[in-house]
Amino acid sequence: MTNGGAENMLVDIINYQVKHEDVSLLVVNDLYDESIFARLNKRCQVKMLKRDVGSKNPFVILRLNAYLLTHHFDIVHLHNVDMIKYLFVKCNYVRTVHNTNQIYHNYRWHKGIIAISDAVHDELLGQGIRNSIMIRNGVNFRLIKQRNDIHTNCVFRMVQVSRILFVQKGQDILVEALAKLKDKGIEHFHLDFIGTGPDMQKLQTLIYENGLEENITLLGNQPREFIYSHLCDYDLFIQPSRFEGFGLTVAEAMGAKIPVLVSENEGPIAIIDKGKYGFAFQNKSVDACAKQIEYVMNHYPSQKFIDDAYEHVTKLYNVEVTAQHYLDLYYKIVPIC
């Protein structure tokens, strides 16, 4: 339960569902963010197994299965792609598939498979999994502070929020794109990276090698409250992912009423409706990313464009709708008496 988009959304979903049903949360690894649990409704029962990350201790697996065996849950909802291979208690399993580029996984005993986007749903179909349903991810937009004015900063302020993981999130593409802008003499910009991850040291090195120490700040991991309060301070949100099943942070930025620039892949391009509500660049292309950043700097979108994007995203990706669709699926699997 780290401070990621899926984890934060899960807390929002639980907080909605505990109003209607008894909900428990089982956390396997001893890796969690206190700010996540601080937001969790106290009516949710939490069980911590405190497994060391990477541990193969069979006792943890036994405790996991014993917990399921003794509690007789009507639904067991999995959010981890590998979890089912450690479970030998037959239950009504539901799984949410949160990303693309996933290899085929075991779906034994599953009564429901949820794809978070059309891209994920299509990939599952390509793997021969035809019984998945699409339930869009959701955001609690009421908590996000909105920007009320058009770009006025002397320095063009950009932000990128995600796990620091080059192979998926593409932070290296963004840094190299900004280096190209600086080589052209464009220097009136600043980028904040929010998040941590396995490539943090590589990111620091890349920034230094490109002479961008004055233009880029690494803010590290920040609680969601901080992010939701400060997204509105920026002129542009950028998501340069190489692949992405959805892109929750893109929706959040649109909810803050700031323009977004995304790579042309899967989830993010669907959120902006293929460019109707945001800007896009060719996936994996440093040159295209740099070109689009410069374009937005010189052709900043109108307030109407930003307002239309806000209306689009808040209508389509409301977390209470997501949570209710989850409940509706559960009730189909286990009918209410």
Protein language model regions, located:
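N-terminal strand-loop element at the rim of the active site
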Residues: M1-G4, N8-K56, G197-D199
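Carbohydrate-associated surface elements
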Residues: A119, G138
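Conserved donor-binding/catalytic core segment of Leloir-type glycosyltransferases
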Residues: I150-K169, V175-L178
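Nucleotide-activated donor-binding/catalytic signature segment of Leloir-type glycosyltransferases, i.e.
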Residues: Q204-Q222
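Aromatic "clamp/platform" in nucleotide-sugar-dependent glycosyltransferases that forms part
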Residues: R242
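Short hydrophobic beta-strand element within catalytic cores of glycosyltransferases
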Residues: P259-V262
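Conserved acidic donor-binding segment of nucleotide-sugar-dependent glycosyltransferases
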Residues: K274-G275, F279-V286, Y295-Y300
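A short, well-ordered alpha-helix in the C-terminal region of glycosyltransferases
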Residues: S302-L316, H325-D328, K332
